[in-house]
């Protein structure tokens, strides 16, 4: 039996789509030196090559892919989006605006200088900034801009071509810039990280190990009574000295949870909770032959929960003001916008931040009720909320504004982005509403993006040879300029206008470019995870601004003729 593969793929859109995805994902795993191609560029390259062979896909799949992707971007940004406009977030907002605004301005000027159309210009901007949201925003706006069908098809093809030609240029140049730019300025990044660590009491170790607390029991003997010298637990300050917390006392056979006024007595059995190294710091009066095994005393349910910050008495306060240890709880991690941040007593908590806390189940529940709620341990997605807000986003995208003879619509990209932000924000405030497991969100977002990339590549592949020969050299040079010049402008603005700490500034710059590989290089250079504070500050707002930049450059382009 003979099987014509070309006819088989052309006759089955679903089969063609998944063949493109599988081959593209395999290609994306390849590395050029230390740089991995990535899933997006892998799928795009394969789809362009197959598009040259006149394979095509149903455009409905393309539209659904970008809609799912941009909606999930909004959901991820929602919990921390509005907090960016307050306190230190103003600096991050300005940095993101400078980065995105300067890139859009430079791309527009270069597009006019080289005589490109809006498709090539917007595609070059998206590729140089390694930003799929720019590509999505521009493509959606073009489709709703009322262009003649032949001009629309050409613009969309050029959009894909510009993105494909400049993506690797943007990624590699930013990674190289992240490696060498810190060495070109007079402040050492490691010194800057240590400086802010001293000012804020940070842990500069970028590879800090996290242990679960352990429970051990000790019997109070003459040495321990003498060491306590009649002081109560508050006066002894055992936690301040060692990091261990007295959770229970057995006295005369009765178990009790002590308060700060309790005084240790001869024959007491006490249960201490703390990290392994904290037990090692205990006074020898505790440890020298005094450890006991008491099943009931040690029978505590130590749990680790993720607490979402929500309540007004926690939002806007410093981490140290929560006094978690006073409640017998231990902080393991602080996560903001899916980014792990340093354990910093002076970090100002935002609504939607996630604190990973360990301790006795009852105490952790009490702390969670004070500052927010415990994140749902469920793998079930609230599909009703997902679908309802998706519908709202599509309806918002139908809104059209009329100015004299000129009209433009909000478009699906902006509408779905706004609806996603609202769903993410409401999820951060209501524990049982709109829950989407992070793994499920990542899968839908990544799948939507890959479907979108496959669609644009297949549609643009037929004309890539002609386009490459006409603008290839110009496009690569322009991509390099748009990739690096806004970073330099952003650095000068942050360093000399905002006067930011350099470690925080470089992290914020990489967040404004939404580039995780470059962020890892900055952290390695600083030998600290402190730059993650800046990265988290700009990342959420930058994703939104980049989507709007793709929409805006298409809207203003006709007025620049």
Swiss-Prot record:
InterPro entries cross-referenced by the UniProt entry: AAE_transporter, RCK_C, RCK_C_sf, Transp_YbjL_put, YidE_YbjL
Gene Ontology MF terms in the entry: monoatomic cation transmembrane transporter activity
Family as reported in the entry's similarity comment: Belongs to the AAE transporter (TC 2.A.81) family. YbjL subfamily.
Chain ranges of the RCK C-terminal domain: 202-288, 292-373
Zinc recorded as keyword: no
GO biological process: potassium ion transport
Keyword terms, alphabetized: Cell membrane, Membrane, Repeat, Transmembrane, Transmembrane helix, Transport
Major location category of this protein: membrane
Regions that span the bilayer: 8-28, 37-57, 66-86, 94-114, 158-178, 383-403, 406-426, 447-467, 478-498, 540-560
Location relative to the cell: Cell membrane
A GO CC term attached to the entry: plasma membrane
Name of the protein described by the UniProt record: Putative transport protein KPK_3686
Membrane association type: Multi-pass membrane protein
Naturally occurring in which organism (per UniProt): Klebsiella pneumoniae (strain 342)
């Amino acid at each position: 039996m003979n099987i014509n593969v070309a006819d088989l793929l052309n006759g089955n859109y679903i089969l063609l789509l998944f063949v493109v995805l599988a081959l593209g994902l395999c290609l994306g795993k390849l590395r050029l030196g230390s740089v991995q191609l990535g899933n997006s560029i892998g799928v795009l390259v394969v789809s362009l090559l197959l598009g040259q062979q006149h394979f095509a896909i149903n455009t409905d799949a393309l539209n659904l892919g970008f809609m799912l992707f941009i909606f999930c971007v909004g959901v991820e940004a929602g919990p921390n989006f509005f907090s960016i406009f307050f306190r230190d977030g103003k600096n991050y907002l300005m940095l993101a605006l400078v980065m995105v605004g300067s890139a859009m301005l430079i791309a527009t000027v270069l597009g006019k200088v080289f005589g490109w159309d809006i498709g090539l210009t917007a595609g070059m901007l998206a590729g140089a900034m390694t930003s799929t949201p720019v590509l999505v925003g521009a493509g959606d706006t073009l489709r709703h801009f009322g262009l003649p069908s032949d001009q629309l098809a050409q613009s969309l093809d050029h959009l894909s071509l510009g993105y494909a030609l400049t993506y690797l240029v943007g990624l590699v140049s930013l990674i190289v810039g992240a490696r060498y730019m810190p060495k070109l300025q007079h402040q050492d990044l490691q010194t800057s990280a240590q400086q802010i660590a001293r000012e804020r009491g940070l842990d500069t170790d970028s590879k800090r190990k996290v242990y679960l607390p352990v429970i051990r029991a000790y019997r109070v003997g003459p040495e321990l009574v003498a060491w306590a010298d009649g002081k109560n637990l508050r006066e002894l300050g055992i936690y301040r000295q060692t990091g261990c917390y007295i959770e229970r006392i057995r006295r005369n056979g009765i178990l009790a949870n002590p308060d700060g006024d309790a005084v240790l007595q001869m024959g007491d059995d006490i249960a201490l909770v703390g990290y392994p190294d904290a037990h090692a710091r205990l006074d020898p009066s505790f440890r020298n032959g005094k450890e006991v095994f008491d099943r009931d005393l040690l029978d505590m349910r130590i749990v680790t929960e993720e607490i979402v910050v929500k309540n007004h008495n926690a939002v806007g306060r410093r981490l140290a003001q929560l006094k978690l240890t006073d409640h017998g709880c231990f902080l393991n991690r602080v996560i903001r916008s899916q980014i792990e941040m340093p354990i910093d007593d002076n970090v100002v908590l935002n609504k939607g931040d996630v604190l990973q806390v360990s301790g006795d189940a009852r105490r952790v529940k009490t702390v969670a009720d004070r500052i927010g709620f415990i994140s749902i341990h469920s793998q079930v997605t609230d599909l009703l909320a997902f679908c309802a807000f998706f519908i709202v986003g599509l309806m918002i995208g139908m809104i059209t504004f009329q100015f004299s003879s000129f009209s433009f619509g909000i478009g699906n990209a902006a509408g779905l982005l706004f609806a996603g932000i609202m769903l993410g924000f409401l999820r951060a405030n209501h524990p049982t509403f709109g829950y989407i497991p992070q793994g499920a969100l990542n899968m839908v977002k990544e799948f939507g993006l890959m479907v979108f990339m496959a669609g644009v590549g297949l549609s643009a592949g037929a004309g890539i040879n002609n386009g490459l020969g006409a603008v290839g050299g110009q496009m690569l040079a322009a991509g390099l300029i748009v990739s690096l010049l806004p970073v330099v402008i952003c650095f000068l603005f942050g360093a000399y206008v905002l006067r930011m700490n350099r470690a925080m500034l470089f992290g914020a710059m990489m967040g404004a470019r939404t580039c995780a590989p470059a962020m890892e290089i900055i952290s390695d250079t600083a030998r600290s995870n402190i730059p993650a504070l800046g990265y988290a500050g700009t990342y959420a707002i930058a994703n939104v601004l980049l989507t709007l930049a793709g929409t805006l450059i298409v809207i203003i382009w006709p007025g620049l003729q």
